[in-house]
Amino acid sequence: MNPTSNKSDFEELTTSLKDLAYSYLEKYSPSKQQLKVFLLKKYLTKIKGTTSKKEVSLIIDEIVNNLEKKRIINDELYSDSKARMFLKRGYSLNKINQSLRIKGIEDKFIKQSIEKIKEDKIEPDFVSALKLCKRRRIGPLRPTANREIFYKKDMGILARGGFSFELSKRV
């Protein structure tokens, strides 16, 4: 199936998008959604062909599906690695969930990653909250003279980090 009327234009567009995809994959480890968005943006800004967006998105989907079949892109591994990285940074499980959703990861992969984290660690949210406190020098790591003064501010920082009120009080 050839979505464009001119076969040489179609082949040229496909090869240029494949080249862009491979060069992007050399630099970064993206999810499927991130790669699709990147290729579409590059097409709209740099290539600017005569084919419609619908035809281009079909070509991009085909390229991404090919890469997934070749196991060059794997959203499950991406989800696991990002979830572990976010946990090391001090993200709460809620914030990890939200960040992965924004990156276009499927819900089943997100749930699997969070379950793996829960199996590995005892109270991952509490550990992450302590890491956040250490990084921002808030809560128990703030000088004792200033703790009561900055209590509300510290609670707000933890709440914006995705931690529950009870957990924030415990920290």
Where are these regions (language model features)?
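An alpha-helical, amphipathic repeat domain used for nucleic-acid recognition
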Residues: 1-171
